[in-house]
A protein has these predicted regions:
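A short Gly-Trp-Pro
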Residues: 1-8, 13-119
Length: 119
């Protein structure tokens, strides 16, 4: 059974539909130079299970590093990071768990840290 969740930025100009086939999966934090500054809890999702429903024109993309492979999306208006295309697996996105209203990201404990510092 598919479970649909809606992810929004703070100002609600960006709305993203997540098809969470098995709920929130593969929680992770990252210690790369960008992620350690923003401190978010992220979860993985297949590309086809994330759809921008509203506000595509409100999303900005930020890339960094030598290869600039990961695309980090954030709202132009409120600045909230919503999701990014995975650097290590381009068939996945990782999304900001805290952007789902009915999920409290502070309840998740012992979240593994991806060693993005090496990238």
């Amino acid at each position: 059974m598919n479970k649909i969740e809606i992810l929004t930025c703070h100002c609600k100009k960006v709305e993203i539909e997540l098809n969470l086939e098995n709920g929130v999966e593969e929680l992770v934090r990252c210690n790369c130079s960008l992620c350690k500054r923003r401190g978010y809890v992220m979860a993985k999702i297949k590309l086809e299970n994330l759809k921008v429903k509203r506000g595509q024109d409100q999303l900005s993309v930020y890339k960094f590093g030598k290869k600039q492979l990961a695309e980090h999306f954030f709202c132009k208006n409120c600045g909230i990071y919503t999701h990014h295309r995975s650097y290590t697996n381009p068939k996945n996105y990782e999304y900001n768990v805290a952007c789902i209203d009915n999920i409290n990201s502070f309840e998740y404990k012992n979240i593994p840290v991806f060693d993005g510092e090496k990238l």
